[in-house]
């Protein structure tokens, strides 16, 4: 099935096939979700079969809204599809734009609506193995340190979020130095 995502072509937002958007480096819409339990964040390691950044650690989940889909609805959908997570309230935290080479001649040039959701630490997680290799809870401070020490283990977008947008995503109480 071809997945059509909202992308800008010659200044106009229109449906574009997802792989084509990455091959051409088109600016396109995306969502990212961070599920938090206190100061811990749920992160995922991307499945080995993903067509870009396989095996790298990323935020809880991220994807592209389908053409015509609202970002908030997309965030809830992908929590369910990727991780089997339901019933959380996702709250819009920020909109971020970035551009990053993700290997294999592909570029992510995303306008990302970022959502945060609070969860209990015993939240049931049931990852789809086609999407997610593994998950883990990690303290936000420890995650920021890990990303600085071993950036090659993490997706470009997670590195960008933590380096450039911590306060805007997590608020003043969760800013890590």
UniProtKB/Swiss-Prot annotation:
Ligand binding (Mn(2+)): 22, 28, 64, 108, 110
Binding site for Mg(2+): 62, 82
Reaction catalyzed: isopentenyl diphosphate = dimethylallyl diphosphate
Cofactor binding, note field: Binds 1 Mg(2+) ion per subunit. The magnesium ion binds only when substrate is bound. Binds 1 Mn(2+) ion per subunit.
Entry EC number(s): 5.3.3.2
Reported cofactor(s): Mg(2+); Mn(2+)
Limits of the Nudix hydrolase domain: 26-160
UniProt entry keywords in alphabetical sequence: Chlorophyll biosynthesis, Cytoplasm, Isomerase, Isoprene biosynthesis, Magnesium, Manganese, Metal-binding, Photosynthesis
GO cellular component terms given for this protein: cytoplasm
GO molecular function: isopentenyl-diphosphate delta-isomerase activity; metal ion binding
One BP annotation, GO: isopentenyl diphosphate biosynthetic process
Active site positions, chain numbering: 62, 110
Enzyme kind, highest EC tier: isomerase
Pathway note: Isoprenoid biosynthesis; dimethylallyl diphosphate biosynthesis; dimethylallyl diphosphate from isopentenyl diphosphate: step 1/1; Porphyrin-containing compound metabolism; chlorophyll biosynthesis
Keyword Transcription: no
InterPro entries recorded: Idi_bact (IPR056375), IsopentenylPP_isomerase_typ1 (IPR011876), NUDIX_hydrolase-like_dom_sf (IPR015797), NUDIX_hydrolase_dom (IPR000086)
Main location: cytoplasm
Annotated compartments: Cytoplasm
Pfam families the UniProt entry points to: NUDIX
Entries under HAMAP family matching the protein: Idi
Task performed by this protein: Catalyzes the 1,3-allylic rearrangement of the homoallylic substrate isopentenyl (IPP) to its highly electrophilic allylic isomer, dimethylallyl diphosphate (DMAPP).
Family membership: Belongs to the IPP isomerase type 1 family.
Protein name as annotated: Isopentenyl-diphosphate Delta-isomerase
Taxonomic lineage of the native organism: Bacteria, Pseudomonadati, Pseudomonadota, Alphaproteobacteria, Rhodobacterales
Name of the gene: idi
């Amino acid at each position: 099935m071809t997945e059509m995502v909202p992308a800008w072509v010659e200044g106009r937002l229109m449906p574009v096939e997802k792989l084509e958007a990455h091959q051409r480096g088109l600016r396109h819409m995306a969502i990212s979700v961070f599920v938090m339990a206190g100061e811990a964040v749920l992160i995922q390691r991307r499945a080995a079969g993903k067509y870009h950044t396989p095996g790298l650690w990323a935020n809880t989940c991220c994807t592209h809204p389908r053409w015509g889909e609202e970002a908030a609805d997309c965030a809830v959908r992908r929590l369910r599809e990727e991780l089997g997570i339901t019933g959380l309230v996702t709250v819009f935290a920020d909109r971020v734009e970035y551009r990053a080479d993700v290997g294999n001649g592909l570029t992510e040039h995303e306008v990302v609506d970022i959502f945060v959701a609070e969860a209990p630490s015993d939240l049931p997680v049931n990852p789809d193995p086609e999407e997610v290799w593994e998950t883990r809870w990690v303290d936000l401070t420890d995650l920021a340190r890990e990303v600085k020490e071993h950036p090659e283990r993490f997706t470009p977008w997670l590195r960008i979020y933590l380096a450039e947008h911590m306060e805007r995503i997590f608020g003043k109480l969760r800013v890590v130095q």
